[in-house]
């Protein structure tokens, strides 16, 4: 009886000791998956910024810091305000109500604005748009030949919103700012690959085959919700605040190309 009890306790003890190890392994695997989904660039996607014959303009999306007045008004709103154009307007405004303005009341309509963007889903399409095809015919050849990427024509790749919306440029800026905060890849709604851009990587084309090297521009796909509202400046004596009325939400999506990057796909065909 004592022997059975000892065996049982030993099994329980071993199980308890192993259990945390299993949990740790699962947590590590989860972290690995998260790392893979964040800027995990496949080996067939290459940075062509140094080789690109067209100098793309780097338009860094920086957060516009509100000044003291703008910050005070933004914090007074019950609806989050992140639109950089609206913040810029507040920064350029001045408001100094008199401290002696007892009983004074007023409201100023500032317009109908997209106020913030909430991202629900973000995914990468490494073959968003084909930009070039290089072909090497070795059907009659007797030796292996090599093929490499050379951009034959200038290619302009544009992204954009997936549906119409009010103040589309403001919405694009908010979406790009939100997307850029979660990736180190250079995002831009437009990128250009210049003619003559090339990479040194070679692809072998054996005899009696035709080699096809396809090049694509990658892009990030964003899906989320934009919050709109009518913004009023409320003045009451020496106090001031922003009030947002008639709040609406709209589902929106966007494609944002990855600047100065190309994805490659190589195929061999025999005829």
What is each model feature region?
Residues 75-86, 127-136, 142, 185:
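Short low-complexity stretches enriched in small and charged residues
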Residues 113, 117-152:
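A glycine-rich, hydrophobic loop/mini-helix early in the fold
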Residues 79, 93-96, 136-149, 270-271:
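Exposed regions on extracellular, virion, or secretory-pathway luminal proteins
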Residues 190-231:
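Amphipathic, membrane-active segments
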């Amino acid at each position: 009886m004592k022997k059975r009890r000892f065996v049982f306790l030993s099994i329980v003890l071993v199980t308890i000791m192993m259990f945390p190890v299993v949990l740790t392994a699962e947590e590590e695997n989860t972290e690995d998956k998260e790392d893979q989904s964040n800027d995990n660039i496949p080996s067939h996607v290459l940075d062509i910024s140094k080789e690109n014959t067209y100098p793309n303009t780097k338009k860094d999306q920086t957060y516009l810091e509100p000044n003291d007045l703008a910050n005070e008004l933004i914090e007074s709103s019950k609806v989050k305000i992140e639109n950089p154009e609206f913040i810029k307007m507040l920064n350029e405004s001045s408001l100094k109500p008199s401290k002696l303005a007892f009983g004074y009341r007023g409201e100023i309509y500032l317009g109908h604005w997209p106020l913030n963007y909430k991202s629900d889903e973000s995914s990468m399409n490494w073959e968003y748009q084909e930009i070039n095809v290089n072909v090497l015919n070795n059907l009659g050849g007797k030796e292996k030949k090599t093929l490499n990427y050379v951009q034959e024509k200038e290619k302009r790749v544009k992204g954009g919103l997936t549906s119409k919306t009010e103040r589309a440029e403001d919405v694009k800026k908010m979406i790009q700012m939100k997307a850029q905060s979660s990736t180190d890849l250079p995002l831009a709604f437009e990128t250009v690959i210049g003619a003559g851009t090339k990479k040194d990587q070679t692809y072998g084309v054996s005899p009696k085959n035709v080699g096809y090297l396809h090049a694509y521009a990658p892009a990030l796909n964003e899906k989320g919700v934009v919050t709109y509202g009518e913004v009023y400046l409320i003045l009451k004596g020496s106090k001031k605040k922003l009030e947002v009325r008639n709040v609406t939400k709209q589902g929106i999506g966007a494609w944002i190309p990855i600047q100065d990057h190309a994805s490659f796909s190589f195929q061999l065909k025999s005829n």
